[in-house]
């Protein structure tokens, strides 16, 4: 039930076209931009690596694409525990390669690829950008409260919140 709580498809704006370009990737593009080569943001949803979907970040992706300045691709990467590490990360790396390989048909400027995400999605975005396969292919990162460490570092935050449910 928790996994499906944030999985309802969102209502999209009238300024954006959406379509599934693969079984696990949704493209958001500004209406009327189909022939323009635009930068792209590959967005990875949060959810503790165990829940969430491309629907849980749909409204955000739609709003970014509605700005008219970029295409956004949301990825439905494989979730733990059914798909242990590094399967989700492998999906992210494969998505970057897909974007590059299909840039012409998607009207994407391969010199302006951004990868981003929130929470665990931010972690995957950072790990993807740092991967040997993707290093040098990604221009920028858009990270919202990314998980960058998960160990007792002695900080006040860890002392106060380090026990119990982490996410």
Regions found by a protein language model. Name each.
Residues 1-8:
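N-terminal targeting or regulatory segments adjacent to alpha/beta-hydrolase or S9 domains
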Residues 8, 13-167:
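Alpha/beta-hydrolase superfamily serine-hydrolase fold, recognizing
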């Amino acid at each position: 039930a928790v996994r499906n709580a944030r999985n309802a498809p969102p209502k999209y704006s009238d300024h954006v076209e959406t379509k599934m370009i693969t079984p696990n990737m949704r493209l958001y593009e500004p209406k009327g931009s189909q022939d323009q080569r635009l930068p792209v943001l590959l967005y990875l949803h949060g959810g503790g690596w165990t829940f969430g979907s491309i629907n849980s970040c749909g409204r955000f992706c739609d709003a970014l694409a509605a700005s008219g300045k970029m295409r956004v691709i949301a990825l439905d990467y494989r979730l733990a525990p059914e798909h242990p590490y590094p399967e989700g990360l492998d999906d992210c790396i494969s998505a970057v390669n897909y974007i590059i390989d299909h840039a012409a048909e998607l009207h994407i400027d391969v010199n302006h690829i951004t990868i981003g995400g929130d929470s665990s999605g931010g972690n995957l975005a950072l790990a993807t950008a740092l991967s040997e396969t993707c290093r040098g292919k990604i221009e920028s990162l858009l990270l919202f409260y990314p998980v960058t460490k998960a160990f007792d570092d002695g900080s006040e935050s860890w002392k106060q919140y380090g026990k119990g449910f982490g996410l």
